[in-house]
Amino acid sequence: MSTPVIPDKFLDLFTKKAFAHLATLMSGGEPQVTPVWIDYDGERVIFNTAVGRQKDKNLQRDARVSLSIADPDNPYRYLEVRGRVSERTTSGADAHIDKMAKKYLDKDKYPFRQPGEVRVIFKVTPEHVTSAG
């Protein structure tokens, strides 16, 4: 099965300051939704969190996700990506969160780091892509 492609006309959502709403599953099956900063490597949607947060725990147990990304300039234009985490790594996660801080906050360093916090990157391989607008 081939990986669904993000339509070219929606790739700008990954360069704008668009937040994704990330849905993961709790151990009892309830959905848990969190806004996250997003990135795209041409094949996978990427987000970053701290080890031990609820989304990290959920994704270590169940790799399925859904992301909804609305255009900040036109909320009726959006992208939905359903898929699975294909990679979880701490390698490069500090540099990546700083890159995201530059994009979203215009700060060179992520300003909300907590003492002892370990950052982790998740890469999501799309299995279903829907768009509108």
Predicted regions and their residues:
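Short beta-strand segments
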Residues: A18-V51, L59, V65-I69, E80
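Extreme N-terminal tail/first-helix region
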Residues: M1-A20
